[in-house]
A protein has these predicted regions:
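Active-site metal-coordination segments of metallo-dependent hydrolases
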Residues: 18, 39, 43-47, 101-123, ...
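Short secondary-structure boundary/capping segments
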Residues: 29, 41-45, 52, 147-155
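A broad, structural surface signal
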Residues: 25-29, 33-37, 54, 96, ...
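Cytosolic-facing loops and C-terminal tails of multi-pass membrane proteins
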Residues: 73-76, 80-99, 103-110, 128-541
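Short, well-ordered loop/turn elements at secondary-structure boundaries
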Residues: 5, 20-22, 124-126, 204-205
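Basic, amphipathic N-terminal segments
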Residues: 1, 52, 59-62, 70-79, ...
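Post-HEXXH active-site segment of zinc metalloproteases
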Residues: 37-71, 118, 128-138, 143
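Peri-catalytic and regulatory segments of divalent metal-dependent proteins
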Residues: 1-44, 48
């Protein structure tokens, strides 16, 4: 904690695979900038002190169990235990306040250390290489994780990758192309505008608990250094290796050797991966004519029968224009901002002030601001509802000109009926999830037993809903053997999750997996029904 320690730096091949030589030099300069900082030792010391205080305050289950045990020995002990507990709780309250102060200062120091390390890198390579790398790394991380997730889902088929890093590169470039991200130096040139394309929020809350500054803050600091340069280097960093592909294959084997396969493994060639990736994207996306309008929005609930009486002229390009898509994400951002402000008001987030649309507000102003935002949100939603009405009328007019027997009204009504049923299923998931939150907390034994008795009725409804999902023809290809087996075990009887003094972990895991799979399947079921409607509409064009 105080004496010097050996400084090790691990560089991931996935990182090397996503940057140029100059960008890698900037990243390494940033890391070595940390090594040169005297504040690193102070930060390490504060971190360890902080960790000790945290364990004293929050990781003390054995102490709580000891107190409960002493209180249960005899009634004569109860009074003394209660008095002692009140004194200890007061001391803990003081320590918690001290912990908050130490932690906030440590986090602030940590953020400053990041800025200083960025400045070190900028002095060595100029700012631009580090800016480009920082902006691209989230795409690189997403691409690498997606490739790994693909094989996690393919475990029953015993597929393994020959070279997961080539798959990472393919996904990264493919995503850049479909999102119209330009290329520079053979790599996607990601910008802040592209990252925040769908973020229309005007709310800015400085997170005093964050250990790293935000990406936007880091880039603004780097740009202010006035040493940005042209992107002269176009050489991929992985060319620094004598045989990068051999290294990638060796590391890929090490990654997949950790997995136990039931049968003989099958190496999945890159061409097959590319084909399956594109098929999966197509399966889980809506037709391109919608321009992303429905990606995070569902058609508004309408009485479409009345809308058949008036048919107007509209253009597809207007109904799904970039302006209409922006309107969708503006409404979503308003809704998120309102929810965040309400959490601040409820003291979920501890802040004294915040910025909204360039103006500083205090916590006491939240209710007034929320009321204004709700009016604005209602206005945006009305605009979107009107656009949905126009969309329906547009496709209805096309259908009437092409088909003798129109079906669009039936498709919409079926979708709206299903939506109402799906909302009930989702509510059931939320209800049970909230009801079992206590298993994550320290809870007295008698309260645990009482809480489990309260969820019996909810579980009964959940099991009914699971049976319906198992019989849904549209979901048969989505229900894996492992999921079906766990469902059937869960449905087989009424399970007990807690004994006298401990949880039955196997039973709990089974129930939590059933609940998680239920949520996945109702989401998938909703997507299937929504896509049926949208595909029918698109097919009319």
């Amino acid at each position: 904690m105080i004496l010097p320690v050996k400084k090790n730096l691990l560089i991931g091949v996935g990182l090397v695979n996503a940057v140029t030589i100059l960008e890698l030099k900037a990243i390494l300069s940033h890391e070595f900038g940390h090594f040169s900082q005297k504040t690193t030792k102070v930060g390490s010391f504060v971190y360890n002190i902080n960790h000790i205080i945290f364990n004293m305050l929050y990781e003390n289950d054995s102490y709580d169990m000891l107190v409960q045990g002493l209180a249960g020995i005899s009634r004569s002990f109860v009074f003394f235990v209660v008095v002692a507990m009140k004194i200890i709780q007061f001391i803990q309250w003081i320590l918690r306040k001290m912990y908050d102060v130490v932690n906030i200062n440590y986090r602030g120091l940590s953020r400053q250390m990041e800025f200083h390390a960025d400045e070190t890198a900028a002095n060595i390579t100029d700012s631009q290489p580090l800016i480009d790398a920082l902006l691209r790394l989230s795409l690189a991380e997403f691409s690498f994780n997606f490739a790994l997730d693909f094989y996690n889902l393919s475990l029953p088929k015993n597929f393994i990758s020959e070279n997961v890093f080539r798959e990472q590169e393919y996904i990264m470039n493919y995503q850049a192309r479909i999102n119209n991200i330009p290329f520079a130096n053979k790599f996607p040139l990601v910008t802040l505008k592209a990252i925040n394309k769908f973020n229309k929020s005007k709310l800015i809350i400085k997170d005093q608990w964050a250990s790293h500054p935000g990406l936007k803050d880091r880039i603004e600091r780097l740009e202010k250094l006035n040493n940005t340069s042209q992107r002269a280097d176009s050489v991929p960093a992985n060319t620094l290796f004598q045989n990068i592909e051999e290294t990638q294959i060796i590391i890929t084997k090490k990654l997949f050797n950790q997995i136990n396969h039931n049968n003989e493994i099958v190496i999945n060639p890159l061409s097959d991966f590319e084909k399956k990736y594109e098929e999966e994207l197509l399966k889980n996306s809506y037709d391109k004519i919608y321009n992303g309008y429905y990606d995070d929005r569902n058609p508004a609930l309408l009485d479409v029968t009345d809308l058949t009486k008036e048919i107007n002229d509209f253009y597809l390009s207007d109904l799904f224009s970039s302006e209409k898509v922006d309107l969708v994400y503006t409404a979503l951002s308003l809704e998120n901002d309102i929810n965040t402000l309400l959490q601040v008001n409820d003291k979920t987030f501890k802040i004294k002030s915040f910025d909204y649309d360039g103006r500083r507000y205090k916590k006491k102003d939240i209710n007034r601001l929320v009321d204004l935002l709700k009016v604005e949100l209602d206005n945006k939603n009305e605009q979107l509802k009107l656009n949905d009405i126009n969309i329906f009328r547009f496709f209805l007019k096309i259908e009437e000109s092409k088909l003798d027997k129109p079906n669009l009204v039936d498709y919409y009504n079926d979708y709206f009926t299903f939506t109402k049923e799906s909302d009930k299923k989702a509510k059931l998931y939320v209800e049970l999830s909230n009801a079992i939150q206590f298993i994550q907390l320290k809870t007295p034994f008698d309260q645990i037993q009482s809480n489990f008795r309260k969820i019996v009725a909810i579980e009964y409804e959940l099991k009914k809903a699971i049976k319906e999902l198992l019989s849904d023809k549209d979901l048969q290809t989505e229900i894996k053997d492992e999921t079906k087996e766990n469902f059937e075990r869960y449905l087989s009887k009424d399970w007990v999750y807690f004994g006298q003094t401990k949880y039955f972990d196997d039973n709990l895991r089974m129930m939590l997996k059933a609940l998680g799979d239920y949520h996945y399947l109702i989401s998938t079921e909703y997507f299937i029904h929504k896509k049926k409607l949208l595909n029918y509409q698109a097919g009319l064009i």
